[in-house]
Amino acid sequence: MTKRSDDRRVVILQALRDSPRDVSGELLASELGVSRVAVRKHIEALHELGYEIDARAGEGYTLVSSPDAPLPLEVRPLLHGDFYARLEGGRVTGSTNDDARSLALEGAPEGTVVLAAQQTSGRGRLGREWSSPAGGVYASVVLRPAVETPEAIVLPLVVGLGVARGLDTLGVQTLLKWPNDLLCVDGRKVAGVLLEGLSEGWLISWIVAGVGVNVRTAPDRERSASVDELFGRRMPLADVAAAVLDGIAVAYRRWQADGFAPFAAEYESRSYLAGRQVRVSDAAGRVLAEGEVAGIDALGRLLVSTGTGTVPIVAGDVTLRED
């Protein structure tokens, strides 16, 4: 679907939403500068996307209902700035990260996004299953930072902070659990971040920044929360997607210009782990450090104070100690 087609369908939807009565095909054709046949084709395309639009001969069109999905033509008008070059998807897919990876390998530009309201094969860090039920916002962004691989280690933190800022604008406050989770104040998970990429030698070729946000429901009520629950009412998925994408774009561009140092203090102020007793393990389950979280450094490493000193952690699984 081209951006021009999206733009015309946005105009049609806005006209239908703004009118208390049927909108004639003739009026829509005049506003768009196209034929009534072209208008009918756009209406048919909107039907395929899940919009219910009544058409009555001699009267016109009425919008009955809209799909509960972060569709590109709903999200794009809400975005600020010019970072996002291309938006795809919006409904159900296996994995937005897989889709975005395929686009990146085909040469898709930075700022290409794949959106979905449900994933059937979502995954988290280390290939773990990531429950992605219907009514969520799942977005994967193609990034092409001109940096060497070690510099990109902090990107999960930058993206996570961008997501937190985006949710702030919706009135949803979250805390950051290093390295890739966003939690509500009681420790339940609201969103997660997964970055995957390809490097050529020391240089990054591309990175896919994947984000999943619980909006309608939480997969596990004891361990996760939803935006709707925290906000107190039903939040349009397009609004959540646009807020999150805007937050990521601003944070990413600041990181490109100034590195991670300007983010360190804000990240610590939003840290769920600050001052808590934790155990950090590697992928094989080996304990890397146990002690109190002292913060993060300018390189994005988690600092854990043990009985013998402070251990900087580059990567690992963090669990709270109960003892």
PLM segments and residue spans:
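N-terminal lobe of the biotin/lipoate ligase/transferase fold
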Residues: 2-166
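Catalytic beta-strand/loop module used to bind and position nucleotide/cofactor moieties
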Residues: 3-4, 8-12, 31, 110, ...
